[in-house]
């Protein structure tokens, strides 16, 4: 009788877990860009050693372009990055990903970091505003 009860409880538990897993898989995946249009955090910029390497979207990285790496925004998204220390801002295209253990929210090209004025410090606090998939009109 104890074995029967144990088997029944085990079977019931597995059935409940299976139903729960199926329900979770039908929920649409939440995208970072649709939930939060503004993020705050720490920014850095690419080392020169990455020049000429492929980015996550297949483009060749150039420190002279206004591009950036971000872990949750869709590739091809344009964002406005504002340096919170000096209020300078720049629009960049997300074309790469950060290392998954990186605590920064964005890694910018050298050109973008120069426009934001943090080459000497190497890091700065920023505001990142999602603009969308189309480049902003100038």
Feature-to-residue mapping (PLM):
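Secreted/periplasmic proteins
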Residues: 2-6, 10, 18-138
């Amino acid at each position: 009788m104890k074995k029967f009860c144990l088997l029944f409880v085990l079977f019931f538990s597995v059935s409940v877990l299976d139903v729960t897993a199926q329900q979770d898989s039908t929920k649409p995946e939440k995208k970072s860009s649709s939930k939060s249009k503004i993020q705050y955090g720490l920014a850095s910029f690419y080392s020169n050693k990455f020049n000429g390497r492929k980015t996550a979207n297949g483009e060749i990285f150039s420190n002279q372009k206004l591009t950036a790496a971000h872990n949750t925004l869709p590739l091809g998204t344009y964002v406005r990055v504002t340096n919170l220390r000096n209020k300078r801002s720049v629009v960049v295209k997300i074309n790469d990903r950060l290392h998954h253990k990186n605590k920064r929210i964005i890694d910018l090209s050298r050109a973008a970091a120069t426009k934001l004025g943090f080459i000497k410090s190497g890091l700065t606090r920023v505001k990142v505003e999602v603009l969308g998939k189309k480049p902003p009109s100038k």
